[in-house]
C-alpha cells in the first residue's frame, strides 16, 4: 500500500459455498474456513493488525437464515461499513438478497456485487461454468427494487456492458472500440444509487479497450466511480494517470467517492 500511495482501503470478504467456486482457488488461497475463499475472520485479522489502514467489509450469504443477524452483529461488534463482495450462484433479485440489500440501505452500507456470465470451461466437474449473479438484468431489477441502497457493480459480467455489442456473454474480457449505448451507461444515467468499482481485470479492460471513450466515461461519471485494485501491481493507477484527467476528477475516483459513501 505504501509503495503505491494508498493510505486506506476497503477490505472485502468472499463468503461462498464450496460447490460454487472453482477448485483452482485452492492454488492461491488458503481455504481453511467453511464459509468460503475469503472469510470474515481473515479480514478481521488484518483490520486488527492495522486498524488505520482498512475499512472492514463483510457479505454473508443472504440465503443463510442467519445472514442479516450475522451482518448486524458484525456491524455492532467489528464496525463493518461495507457489504461486499457478493459473488454467488444466485439471481441478485432473489427475495432473500433483496431483504439483505434493504437492510444494508437502512444501515448505510454500500453493496458490492460481482457478476459473471456462463462461459464454458470445457469441464463437467464440479461445474461446467462459473456464473454469478444471473446477469445484468437481474442486477438492474435489484437496483430498482432497493432505491435506498447504494450498489457498486463489479466483475466481467458488469463491465462488459460498457459497450452495446454482443460480446458480454461470449468472452470475459471483450475487445474493440466501445459501441455507444451500452447497458452499463444506461443504468448509470438512470439509477442514482448505482456506482461502479473499477477494480480487477474487468474494470481495467473496460477502460483500456477504448482509451478515448474511457476519458469521456470517467469525466461523465466522475462522482460515481471508485478506484479499486484486485491486483498487486499498479496497472490501474498507471492507466488512469495516463489519460490527462484533471486532479479534481482523479481525486474523486481515487478517494473522494469512497469517502462520500463511507465517511471517516
Model-derived segments and spans:
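Active-site gating/metal-coordination segments in enzymes
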Residues: 22-131
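Acidic-histidine catalytic/liganding microenvironments
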Residues: 50-51, 77, 146, 191, ...
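Catalytic pocket-lining loop regions of alpha/beta-barrel enzymes
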Residues: 81-82, 94-226
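Short, conserved catalytic or adaptor-binding loops enriched in Gly and charged residues
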Residues: 46-49, 186-188, 217-218, 243-244
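Hydrophobic alpha-helical segments typical of transmembrane helices
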Residues: 42, 138, 183, 213, ...
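Mid-to-C-terminal alpha-helical segments outside catalytic/metal-binding sites
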Residues: 1-8, 13, 72-73, 220-226, ...
Amino acid at each position: 500500500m505504501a509503495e503505491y500511495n494508498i493510505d486506506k482501503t476497503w477490505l472485502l470478504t468472499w463468503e461462498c459455498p464450496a460447490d460454487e467456486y472453482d477448485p483452482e482457488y485452492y492454488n492461491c488461497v488458503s481455504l481453511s474456513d467453511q464459509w468460503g475463499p475469503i472469510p470474515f475472520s481473515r479480514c478481521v485479522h488484518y483490520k486488527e493488525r492495522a486498524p488505520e489502514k482498512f475499512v472492514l467489509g463483510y457479505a454473508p450469504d443472504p440465503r443463510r437464515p442467519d445472514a442479516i443477524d450475522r451482518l448486524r452483529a458484525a456491524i455492532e461488534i467489528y464496525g463493518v461499513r461495507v457489504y461486499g463482495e457478493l459473488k454467488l450462484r444466485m439471481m441478485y433479485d432473489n427475495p432473500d438478497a433483496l431483504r439483505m440489500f434493504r437492510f444494508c440501505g437502512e444501515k448505510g452500507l454500500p453493496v458490492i456485487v460481482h457478476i459473471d456470465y456462463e462461459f464454458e470451461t470445457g469441464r463437467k466437474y464440479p461445474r461446467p461454468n462459473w456464473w454469478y449473479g444471473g446477469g445484468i438484468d437481474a442486477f438492474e431489477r435489484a437496483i430498482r427494487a432497493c432505491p435506498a441502497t447504494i450498489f457498486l457493480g463489479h466483475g466481467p459480467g458488469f463491465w462488459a456492458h460498457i459497450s452495446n455489442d454482443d460480446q458480454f456473454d461470449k468472452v470475459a474480457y471483450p475487445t474493440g472500440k466501445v459501441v455507444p449505448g451500452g447497458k452499463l451507461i444506461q443504468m448509470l444515467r438512470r439509477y442514482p444509487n448505482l456506482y461502479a468499482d473499477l477494480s480487477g481485470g474487468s474494470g481495467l479492460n473496460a477502460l483500456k479497450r477504448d482509451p478515448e471513450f474511457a476519458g469521456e466515461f470517467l469525466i461523465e461519471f466522475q462522482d460515481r466511480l471508485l478506484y479499486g485494485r484486485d491486483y498487486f501491481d499498479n496497472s490501474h493507477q498507471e492507466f488512469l494517470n495516463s489519460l490527462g484527467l484533471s486532479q479534481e476528477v482523479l481525486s474523486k475516483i481515487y478517494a473522494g467517492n469512497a469517502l462520500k459513501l463511507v465517511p471517516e
